Amino acid sequence: MSRRKQRKPQQLISDCEGPSASENGDASEEDHPQVCAKCCAQFTDPTEFLAHQNACSTDPPVMVIIGGQENPNNSSASSEPRPEGHNNPQVMDTEHSNPPDSGSSVPTDPTWGPERRGEESSGHFLVAATGTAAGGGGGLILASPKLGATPLPPESTPAPPPPPPPPPPPGVGSGHLNIPLILEELRVLQQRQIHQMQMTEQICRQVLLLGSLGQTVGAPASPSELPGTGTASSTKPLLPLFSPIKPVQTSKTLASSSSSSSSSSGAETPKQAFFHLYHPLGSQHPFSAGGVGRSHKPTPAPSPALPGSTDQLIASPHLAFPSTTGLLAAQCLGAARGLEATASPGLLKPKNGSGELSYGEVMGPLEKPGGRHKCRFCAKVFGSDSALQIHLRSHTGERPYKCNVCGNRFTTRGNLKVHFHRHREKYPHVQMNPHPVPEHLDYVITSSGLPYGMSVPPEKAEEEAATPGGGVERKPLVASTTALSATESLTLLSTSAGTATAPGLPAFNKFVLMKAVEPKNKADENTPPGSEGSAISGVAESSTATRMQLSKLVTSLPSWALLTNHFKSTGSFPFPYVLEPLGASPSETSKLQQLVEKIDRQGAVAVTSAASGAPTTSAPAPSSSASSGPNQCVICLRVLSCPRALRLHYGQHGGERPFKCKVCGRAFSTRGNLRAHFVGHKASPAARAQNSCPICQKKFTNAVTLQQHVRMHLGGQIPNGGTALPEGGGAAQENGSEQSTVSGARSFPQQQSQQPSPEEELSEEEEEEDEEEEEDVTDEDSLAGRGSESGGEKAISVRGDSEEASGAEEEVGTVAAAATAGKEMDSNEKTTQQSSLPPPPPPDSLDQPQPMEQGSSGVLGGKEEGGKPERSSSPASALTPEGEATSVTLVEELSLQEAMRKEPGESSSRKACEVCGQAFPSQAALEEHQKTHPKEGPLFTCVFCRQGFLERATLKKHMLLAHHQVQPFAPHGPQNIAALSLVPGCSPSITSTGLSPFPRKDDPTIP
């Protein structure tokens, strides 16, 4: 914190506490000045203070510094107050220096307070009371530090106000006025009002640009025609009314207020022409234009002929404010009307630095602190003025750049360029308009019949979009030739009449009225095509009737006729423009709205009939209209290659996801998304082996997902035998409960040999997809059909029913040495049960969930029963009535016979991996699978589930977590895989032929 000496802030606080002491009559201390609680005037003499309290006004005055004003009688006085305040005048003291004149009461003349007090302040301070005690009609509107004050229209007085008396010489009062407190409070208010006045000035300039045509044709009298002044029409242009700021002298301004009533009414006539712009509902109260904007001209004082009174001001239908704030309310209304057209200082600021004082020049010091450009809304700083102007449009909502084809508006020129590329194909001869088009010119009609800033008539675009198929068509947005002819006749009528007795609604407010009365029945872009069509058709008649009424209203107004005639005669704009009073203004969603209406015109019948035949209930089928292509989507107009692709595309609109990942079960809408997702599952073999389910051997890439899957197994939500089906997807899982109750637990070696890897399934589906494209069969139908077919075969084959020979394709036939393995099967089962497995359950508990080692070793016939039904799907095995027997020995014999019977035919149809023994239907799938195996180093294999691992520690963790066993393991090799893969009904034990528990000395089996 700075250690510099500060300016005694305690003195200011003590000054504020002075009124409370003085009000109680405690004037014993004469060292401190006494301050009036009402007007903050300070007095050192108690007598003067008591006299002032008796005559002080009830309302505290507001003091404003007039920076550019000099006292005509005291030219040497400074324009700014001095901090010491010794030579400054006492405003309230001089006000009450003549008590006999005031009579200890406020004068009844409403113009006495503000004008006299304003002159008695020696040109340094302007006191504007918010209202007087007797007649509250007087007051001042704070315009600007350099512009003085503009009096409100007071009540009717019998005579003009008297000229102000000469101010007293400075230094009359002995005390000093406490100025810093007042100035500190007024500084913020003054800045806000300056900002409002500058915005209002820009609004007036734009309005004058539109209203200057009234002087060339002969403007009709405004609604507030002054009674008794006659029809005084002025041919003087109105633009000089808002000329650049000139020095205003208060003495001359107030002296001119005592002019005659005829000159006053003549000066008021140009201002009356724009009275309707600030009184939208046509109130009859006149006011001076300087009170709304910045008073650039000397403001004439109100004359006795003026009928404006306080009651009329308060009784106006659009102003519910006190009499002293009427003009401020008009300022707010005028600023709200033209904010959109004047909020961009970049478009209105002159480039060459000449001409009128623009908004950017006035606000320059506020927006450019320290040479940088700062936003006045969010205080963001920019390096250039152009960047600041573009940023300001985000606050004001201005879109200056307009497409000359469709009428859409954009914030920047770059956005317009991107949008205009859409019209290149349809309108190659039309060039983009790179110049900004002011939005306030959207309501002006020209002789060419095209909207301002546009090159294509809206009628032509509507005719091209219309089709003979029927539907709801939009009405033309531009007034017809008959309406224009009626407007021309009204123009001649208004010109010959000279003045209008029934003005109706003002021209500027007709535009606002048309936008407000216009029906808001357009469908949103999120509206479905069916409901949108019904909604549009339901409001078509009422919308047409409203448009016709608005058309009659607009074309019957004289001011509208003047506007039309002016721009038809001048033609001074670079782009012709036409007003669209009967339609909506173009927006960002207009093209989407036209697209929705085009879809609706193509026929609701075709969309409804096609929706019933689509794969989904909510997505419509392609329309059969001639305008759209044979494979074009009626929703997004995308053209697809074939009908099958179109049906899949409609499934995407309906939210279908037919492509399901076989690893994690996640569904996707397209096959490309499934392929991209499947890349994440192609991890190393060790990582895949760690995240496998110990019950159904389903692989997971996420350990949390695996944990949830195991919990579902334990809770009975997923059957133990139904989740490991290789094909069928969701259909196989739906039939899992039936398969588990019938077929029991399946042996994992047979499952792994039967089910192909996810890579193999993906390749098989790709091959099948090529064949199905010729037959126009969807992928989801083929997947569901194959899944349900395989599930049905496995369930029916257990009961001994006959089935097709296609069931044999779902089995695995890598049993080249099944005879040798079959002879050793009994011994393998016994040793496995004794050495590596926990005690088995009773033989009759086949329906109980078995651990992985029990299901894989086939304890008590479960192994054989799980393997036998898979082979009984062939016609030969289906005829054996012993398939339903529960005897253990009979099941084992039948399984050996079936295995011996199927060896020759199946060994040649499928390819087995030499490393892990997994079977594949084609050589290409086998080669793709072999890439996942490491080329060097031994592969440690689990003796229970035959999964391979690169490291012994990984295998140890696997056996502890999955099988809860610590058993010897051996490196995996081609000589061991023969015995492991050729026995379909059981898993190899450590005492099998070809598999040694200690294959080498440097690889101990027990850690």
Curated annotation (Swiss-Prot):
One of its GO terms (molecular function) is RNA polymerase II transcription regulatory region sequence-specific DNA binding. Keywords: DNA-binding, Isopeptide bond, Metal-binding, Nucleus, Phosphoprotein, Repeat, Transcription, Transcription regulation, Ubl conjugation, Zinc, Zinc-finger. It is found in: Nucleus. The keyword Repeat applies. The modification Phosphoserine is found at S243, S797, S802, S806. Residues 99-108, 734-744 have a biased composition (Polar residues). InterPro entries: Sal_C2H2-zinc-finger, Znf_C2H2_sf, Znf_C2H2_type. Residues 862-871 have a biased composition (Basic and acidic residues). A zinc finger (C2H2-type) spans 34-56, 373-395, 401-423, 631-653, 659-681, 691-713, 911-933, 940-963. It comes from the Eukaryota. GO terms for cellular component: nucleus. Pfam families: zf-C2H2, zf-C2H2_6. There is a cross-link at K911 (Glycyl lysine isopeptide (Lys-Gly) (interchain with G-Cter in ubiquitin)). GO terms for biological process: eye development; positive regulation of transcription by RNA polymerase II; regulation of transcription by RNA polymerase II. Residues 1-33, 59-121, 137-177, 220-243, 286-306, 520-540, 610-629, 714-886 are annotated as: Disordered. Coiled coil: none annotated. Residues 70-80, 747-757 have a biased composition (Low complexity). Residues 758-782, 803-812 have a biased composition (Acidic residues). Highest levels in adult brain (in different areas). Lower levels in heart; very low levels in kidney and pancreas. Expressed throughout the retina and lens vesicle as well as the periocular mesenchyme. Residues 151-171 have a biased composition (Pro residues). It is linked to Coloboma, ocular, autosomal recessive: An ocular anomaly resulting from abnormal morphogenesis of the optic cup and stalk, and incomplete fusion of the fetal intra-ocular fissure during gestation. The clinical presentation is variable. Some individuals may present with minimal defects in the anterior iris leaf without other ocular defects. More complex malformations create a combination of iris, uveoretinal and/or optic nerve defects without or with microphthalmia or even anophthalmia. Probable transcription factor that plays a role in eye development before, during, and after optic fissure closure. Belongs to the sal C2H2-type zinc-finger protein family. This is Sal-like protein 2.
